[in-house]
Amino acid sequence: MMDQARSAFSTLFGGEPLSYTRFSLARQVDGDNSHVEMKLAADEEENVDNNMRGNHASVPKPKRCNGFICYGTIAVVLFFLIGFMIGYLGYCKRVEPKAGCERPTGTEALGTERTEPSETEEYFPETPSRLFWTDLKTMLSERLSNTDFTNTMRWLNENSYVPREAGSQKDESLALLIENRFREFQLSKSWRDEHFVEIQVKSSNAQNTVTIVDMESDLVYLAESPEGYVAYSKATTVTGRLVHVNFGTKKDFENLKSPVNGSLVIARAGKITFAEKVANAQSYNALGVLIYMDQARFPIVNARIPFFGHAHLGTGDPYTPGFPSFNHTQFPPSQSSGLPSIPVQTISRAAAEKLFENMEGDCPSAWEIDPSCRLETSSNKNVNLTVNNVLKEIRIFNVFGVIKGFEEPDRYVVIGAQRDAWGPGAAKSSVGTALLLELARIFSDMVLKGGFKPSRSIVFASWSAGDFGAIGATEWLEGYLSSLHLKAFTYINLDKAILGTSNFKVSASPLLYSLLEKTMKDVKHPITGQSLYRDSNWINKVEKLSLDNAAFPFLAYSGIPAVSFCFCEDTDYPYLGTTMDLYENLNQKIPQLNKMARGAAEVAGQLIMKLTYDLELNLNYEMYNDRILSFVRDMNQFRTDIKEMGLNLQWLYSARGDFFRATSRLTTDYKNAERTNRFVMREINDRIMKVEHNFLSPYVSPRDSPFRHIFWGSGSHTLPALVEHLKLRQKNKSAFNETLLRNQLALATWTIQGAANALSGDIWDIDNEF
């Protein structure tokens, strides 16, 4: 058959036997085996020679005119087809309709097959057309101006979903509703995960009580049987004299004239978390803690309003420290070191005033406190505190929705809000949840109808059990500890975003400072119309993320840059954590609530767009140069002490210098990078997004010291702890531990050096003589 075909083809081109070889017209892609056979001159000569030898006869050469004409015709046709295909494909890329170039139903593009895209093609899809930044800002603003946030807040505070304590039926119902909303918004995907965690609640069989004991008459007076409580308090009974410790900060305890050893203490709410107040009291050997809301700071008319909090000096489920509480997890018999060993209870202002009636000594005027305040109980009076809280296992749901990125879907920014609340939770959880839902709807609409094509993915998260120490968020982080820092590059927290109108406050990782400054310059205050950027010195006013902020575990535990912001006043919002945290009270306190919500949504929205729009990640790694330099300056104050121990700071100076050079080199690499080369840009972005994670100390266990960040974490491995330890040598040398100090200095230095090495890139690019 082949011989016959060859003979016929030979006859067609002048009767000359021909030989062919395979030659690809185009570069082979994904194993394409399409070829055109071309005649080779060498083969022709060899074939002629063979024929002459085989036949022993001379064969006259045929005329070649017809063959040249055919070859020319084929070449012209081929060049025409190739030109047509190049023009067609170029037109497709420029026009970019929704589903590629339109073609009749059931047909495919010429010369293509129905094959699955290769992994490389799927990982780096074709670059979508990009809108200008000004167009995106306008698109976001227009959609925000047509959004009624207060309507969403209102239905979140309907009786169907209030109160919604973590694990309750109403909390679960709202979780399912949010998941359905994500589906209605046509997000790329929505899902939920469940955790089984232990929380502490009030006992249904025994009351918590605070009583006054008259030691002379043995009479006992009930001050209060509080409705509120503090989760994770030790369940026990203690009796002793009562001492006022102002807010219960470390400085407050240091300034006390009366010792609290063997006594109960009473502290005002505010300034620091309940857990920190209890930890400070415990460090001074107090027996127990009472917390109340004074009228000077919390001007609530009703003096009997109960309130709630937790005393766990940490985040997540304290009975599964460092590992996730999924249903299949085999829970070891362990608990967090942050659990208190003393009882703690919230009391109403009315109960506190009863206690003050049995105390003596005026409180210092510097405290700026109610005139009824007294310092300590009289010599013949004691206070008895009984806490009967019990543990309860609950199931909680975290709900997620994602808009997948068009170029790097495996890199994502996470935006989240707490869903649960003890009490109505209007300001505490409804505001954040409303912002989350509306932003998910708006961004989905921008993608589906507005032409916005984010390069990276946007994940929307609704957390449960936030009131018990960001349990939902922390358990999720623990569940994906080994991979999240490689994928999630920023967390934006929406909790308590609107508590007032006067100020705009931010707590964030230094990596986000530059992005925040750009955003503040772009966004106007919803009421005054002035730029949110008012002070060039704003960075020095940034507050550290607190333990009760859901952004804290992202930064300190997982090493993911995080930001939390709020419109608020200089004073505390009075109803947080109380039964008066109602929508009506929030709307009364902030009459222009909808405008403020639009402003908060615009801040979050611009952050999201900037983080998913630009080629380079908007994370300013150079900001940590200032942080490291500040630490080195602090250490220089103790050069004499360090020298007396036979140590020096040369290694620290070297590590600091290497980090500075690494940041400079990365900046140079970025400036010289080819923007259209996605592989190069991705490699640079990967180095940037790992900076925060590289400051997690690799020398401590996530289980024993979960907050491993040397700048923002807690524990002896942190840089602030190292400085405090050196201060202790000057104040109380007998309490100083030189062996610990040597370890602290060495491990801190190596952590900074490791961060510098990682930022430098490949090992052959690391240039240091450490």
Swiss-Prot record:
The keyword Cell membrane applies. Residues 91-770 are extracellular. Residues 102-122 are annotated as: Disordered. Residues 579-770 are annotated as: Ligand-binding. GO terms for biological process: intracellular iron ion homeostasis; iron ion transport; positive regulation of B cell proliferation; positive regulation of isotype switching; positive regulation of T cell proliferation; receptor internalization; transferrin transport. The modification Phosphotyrosine is found at Y20. The modification Phosphothreonine is found at T21. A motif (Cell attachment site) lies at residues 656-658. InterPro entries: PA_dom_sf, PA_domain, Peptidase_M28, Peptidase_M28B, TFR-like_dimer_dom, TFR-like_dimer_dom_sf, TfR1/2_PA. The modification Phosphoserine is found at S10, S19, S24. One of its GO terms (cellular component) is melanosome. A motif (Stop-transfer sequence) lies at residues 61-64. One of its GO terms (molecular function) is transferrin receptor activity. Keywords: Cell membrane, Disulfide bond, Endocytosis, Glycoprotein, Host-virus interaction, Lipoprotein, Membrane, Palmitate, Phosphoprotein, Receptor, Signal-anchor, Transmembrane, Transmembrane helix. Gene3D superfamilies: 3.50.30.30, Transferrin receptor-like, dimerisation domain (1.20.930.40), Zn peptidases (3.40.630.10). Belongs to the peptidase M28 family. M28B subfamily. This is Transferrin receptor protein 1.
